[in-house]
UniProtKB/Swiss-Prot annotation:
Pathway: tRNA modification; N(7)-methylguanine-tRNA biosynthesis. Transmembrane segments: none annotated. It is an enzyme of class 2 (transferase). Substrate binds at residues 122, 154, 191-194. It catalyses: guanosine(46) in tRNA + S-adenosyl-L-methionine = N(7)-methylguanosine(46) in tRNA + S-adenosyl-L-homocysteine. Gene3D superfamilies: Vaccinia Virus protein VP39. It comes from Streptococcus pneumoniae serotype 4 (strain ATCC BAA-334 / TIGR4). This is tRNA (guanine-N(7)-)-methyltransferase. Belongs to the class I-like SAM-binding methyltransferase superfamily. TrmB family. Keywords: Methyltransferase, S-adenosyl-L-methionine, Transferase, tRNA processing. S-adenosyl-L-methionine binds at residues 44, 69, 96, 118. Residues 124-129 are annotated as: Interaction with RNA. One of its GO terms (cellular component) is tRNA methyltransferase complex. InterPro entries: SAM-dependent_MTases_sf (IPR029063), tRNA_(Gua-N-7)_MeTrfase_Trmb (IPR003358), tRNA_methyltr_TrmB_bact (IPR055361).
Length: 211
């Protein structure tokens, strides 16, 4: 999600350290201390403008959520939503999520969300897809044994690729939805992209994969 630079984004992020972790490298292995409890920690990579991560935090007060995005302006809009929701169980990171081992200890998080990731449709860009095997290597490290990835996309090609990638990696597919919004799945929290795509009648795909 590319957005225009937002004036004052840096100042807004820096003014809210209760939600924005300003020194993420120092947070490694200390996330439960930062949240002040031992509740499960769920991470969304590429949290965009924050509709999903803030909605999940409000819906599940006994789970801690971390939203990650590389774009400062985007994350500042996510912070707007977090401030609006006003719940304590959420943190935001302005970092590149390509190597999460920089910010999380082995087994430190309990679930990972990949929502509407860039599909990188060209074959030569396969290694940039977040469900490529090298990313799965990283995700497996920071998740516990039997940790899960919950994945949503509107891109059929990326969905099919990811199913194959998960399976070839040896992961167990605990749930596959070929049309999420037409299913009986309960508790779905939509991202901004998801709302936009669903309003246009596009099918949303979902999978839960376990290491």
């Amino acid at each position: 999600m590319r957005v225009r630079n937002r004036k004052g984004a840096t100042e807004l992020l820096e003014a809210n350290p209760q939600y924005v972790v300003l020194n993420p490298l120092e947070a490694k292995a200390k996330w439960r201390d930062l949240f002040g409890n031992d509740n499960p920690i769920h991470v969304e990579v590429g949290s965009g403008k924050g509709a999903f991560v803030s909605g999940m935090a409000k819906q599940n007060p006994d789970i801690n959520y971390i939203g990650i995005d590389i774009q400062k302006s985007v994350l500042s809009y996510a912070l707007d939503k977090v401030l609006e929701v006003g719940v304590p169980n959420i943190k935001l990171l302005w970092v590149d999520g390509s190597d999460l081992t920089d910010y999380f200890e082995d087994g430190e998080i309990d679930r990972l969300y990949l929502n509407f990731s860039d599909p990188w449709p060209k074959k030569r860009h396969e290694k940039r897809r977040l469900t490529y095997k090298t990313f799965l290597d990283t995700f497996k490290r920071i998740l516990p044994e039997n940790g899960e990835i919950h994945f949503k996309t509107d891109n059929r090609g990326l969905f099919e690729y990811s199913l194959v990638s998960f399976s070839q990696y040896g992961m167990k597919l605990n749930g596959v939805w070929l049309d999420l919004h037409a299913s009986d799945f309960e508790g779905n929290v939509m991202t901004e992209y998801e709302q936009k795509f669903s309003n246009k009648g596009q099918v949303i795909y979902r999978v839960e994969a376990e290491f």
